[in-house]
């Protein structure tokens, strides 16, 4: 089919699985997503099973949704959401970040509406799903830069990645993620992109983008 997957693993709920295709341009990623859902249903049926593409088929256990990755890249390959090692000095990135923050704040109602249906409204707010209220999570590093801009009108420093010490002498220290990933934030910055995590499982992938 030509659809490359990044991960495929079991999830929390019984007989629940995750399949994550590799990032692609919006139109290609959308086609891949629709193709995957259709093929999964057909293959399950051939084996006497049913592939439930429903946000909350069973009460009391984790439901299912999608992560919609938002990135902006120029025609010559520059990622507008790459903060670099010193985000406080990356004025292009800060401009794009500020525009997205303003857009999410101004149009939170449209984003929420784009993720609303009967099944998804039962999923949100419990069992590791994002809350039903739109909020953004930038991580410790970017939050500090933004607060410097708000408080002083200028940002002069960026928190750098720290080391994770395991306490085991046989294991090396590991680099910590400066974005401080939050698994349940509805709209979170994850390294060099945003993830919108409230998307309905059955909806076509561009729906939240169209709403925005």
Task: Place the predicted regions along the sequence by residue.
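Well-ordered beta-sheet/strand-loop patches within structured domains
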Residues: 3-5
């Amino acid at each position: 089919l030509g659809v490359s997957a990044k991960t495929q693993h079991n999830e929390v709920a019984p007989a629940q699985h995750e399949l994550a295709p590799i990032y692609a341009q919006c139109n290609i990623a959308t086609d891949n997503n629709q193709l995957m859902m259709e093929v999964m249903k057909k293959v399950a049926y051939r084996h006497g099973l049913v592939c439930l593409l429903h946000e909350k088929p069973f009460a009391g256990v984790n439901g299912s949704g999608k992560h919609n990755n938002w990135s902006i890249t120029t025609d010559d390959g520059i990622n507008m959401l790459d903060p670099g090692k010193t985000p406080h000095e990356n004025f292009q990135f800060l401009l794009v970040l500020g525009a997205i923050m303003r857009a999410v704040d101004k149009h939170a109602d449209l984003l929420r509406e784009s993720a609303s249906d009967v099944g998804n409204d039962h999923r949100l707010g419990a069992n590791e799903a994002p809350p039903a209220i739109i909020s953004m999570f930038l991580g410790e590093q970017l939050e500090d830069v933004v607060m410097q801009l708000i408080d002083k009108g200028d940002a002069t420093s960026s928190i750098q990645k720290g080391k994770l010490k395991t306490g085991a002498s046989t294991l090396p220290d590991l680099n910590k993620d400066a974005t401080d990933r939050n698994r349940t934030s509805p709209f979170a910055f994850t390294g060099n992109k945003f993830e919108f995590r409230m998307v309905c499982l059955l909806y076509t992938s561009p729906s939240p983008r169209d709403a925005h």
